[in-house]
C-alpha cells in the first residue's frame, strides 16, 4: 500500500511528465522523443536531490516512475486535441508538478535529518530542476531563468512546510499547506503579473 508521500510523488510524476510531453508535441517530437522529454521532466529534480542526499534515486529501484511517464504519453496521444483546446494546459500540469515535488523534496530532506535551509533548497531543486532539463531539451530559455515567479514559489512553499513542521503539525498537513503555498504563489504571480526585477548590466555584447 503506497504511503501518502508516494501518492504525491506519483501524481507529481504524472503531472510533470504531461507538461514535458505537451511541450514536446508542440515542437513536433516523435513518440519516443516526447517520452524522453516527459521522463526527464519527471525524474531529473528528484534524481539530483537524491544524489546530493546520498540516496538511490527512486526510479532506479521502482519502475512506477517509468510507467507513470508511459501513461502520461498515452494520455497525451489519446486526448491531445482536447488538451490543446483546454486553456493553460501546460501551466496547470506544470504548477501541479511543481507544488507536489517541492513538498516531497522538503519532506524527504527533513526526514533524513537535514536542517531546514537544506530542506528548502532540496525542495526547490526537486520542483524546478526537471523544468530546466525539459526546457533545455526543447531549446527554450528555462522558466527558472525568466522573470516569472517559479523557483521562488518553491522557496515559499518550503518555508511554509518548515513552519508547519516546526509547529508540530502532522506531515500530511505540512505537505498540504506547503504544496498549496507553492500552487497559490505561482497562480497569483501569473494572474497579477508579479515578477522578480530584471538585473540590468548594460547592453548585450555584440557577436
Predicted regions and their residues:
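C-terminal ends of transmembrane helices
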Residues: 17-27, 50, 74-87, 132-142, ...
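Cytoplasmic-side transmembrane-helix entry/capping segments in multi-pass membrane proteins
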Residues: 32-40, 62-67, 87-98, 122, ...
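Ordered, amphipathic secondary-structure segments that act as subunit-interaction surfaces
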Residues: 71-108
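Intrinsically disordered, low-complexity non-transmembrane regions of multi-pass membrane transporters
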Residues: 1, 194-207
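N-terminal topogenic module of multi-pass integral membrane proteins
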Residues: 1-53, 58
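Structural signature of hydrophobic alpha-helical transmembrane segments
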Residues: 2-13, 57-71, 115-127
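Short, structured motif recognition centered on aromatic/hydrophobic residues
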Residues: 36-40, 47-53, 121, 125, ...
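Helix-coil boundary and interhelical linker segments in multi-pass alpha-helical membrane proteins
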Residues: 1-4, 50-60, 104-118, 163-174
